[in-house]
A protein has these predicted regions:
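Distinct, well-ordered alpha-helical segments
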Residues: 62-64
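Acidic/histidine-rich, metal-coordinating catalytic segments
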Residues: 41-57, 81, 86
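Generic structural signal for small/hydrophobic residues in well-ordered secondary structure
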Residues: 3-4, 10, 29, 52, ...
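Conserved protein kinase catalytic core
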Residues: 12, 58-59
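C-terminal anion-handling pockets and recognition modules
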Residues: 88-138
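Electropositive, glycine- and tryptophan-enriched low-complexity nucleic-acid-binding patches
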Residues: 1-44
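RNase H-like polynucleotidyl transferase catalytic core
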Residues: 67-87, 104
Length: 138
């Protein structure tokens, strides 16, 4: 499971795959291209993606894919072994604890379906209650 959290819209964007390889992450970047990449005739919003130093984020293929997006996508690298600094980790924790806990999935297709359903519900809740789980900036 890979995801991005849109702080402006408070929306979680998720992609699931059976593998966790650079090609899967690059596919996710293409999804972000479609959602946030520059569009003709529109003002470009700044987009920042925060990445840990996992192998799928640091491979040659991924670095090349990130370089082609450098004109609209800024990368912030987290220090190694510091998941507490990654805000999406809290979202994953909430997703697992409140939507996926105490369930058994017979195969990955059912798990994928449950994840996407949980994300839809979480996004709807965050849209209806914008102050829920909102971090207060220091």
């Amino acid at each position: 499971m890979m995801g991005a959290f849109d702080w402006r819209d408070r929306r979680l964007i998720v992609a699931t795959s059976k593998t966790k390889r650079s090609a899967d992450f690059i596919d996710f970047l293409e999804k972000l291209d479609h959602l946030y990449g520059p569009k003709p005739g529109q003002c470009q919003r700044p987009v920042v993606i925060v990445l840990d130093n996992g192998p799928i984020h640091t491979s040659k293929a991924t670095k090349a894919a990130l370089a082609t997006r450098a004109h609209w996508l800024s990368i912030e690298w987290l220090p190694k072994y510091a998941p507490e600094l990654n805000d999406i980790e809290n979202v994953w924790r909430d997703l697992k604890a409140h939507f996926l806990a105490h369930q058994t999935f017979t195969d990955t297709d059912f798990l994928d379906q449950a994840i996407h359903s949980a994300v839809e519900t979480l996004n709807l809740e965050r849209k209806q209650n914008p102050l829920v789980n909102q971090r207060i900036s220091a």
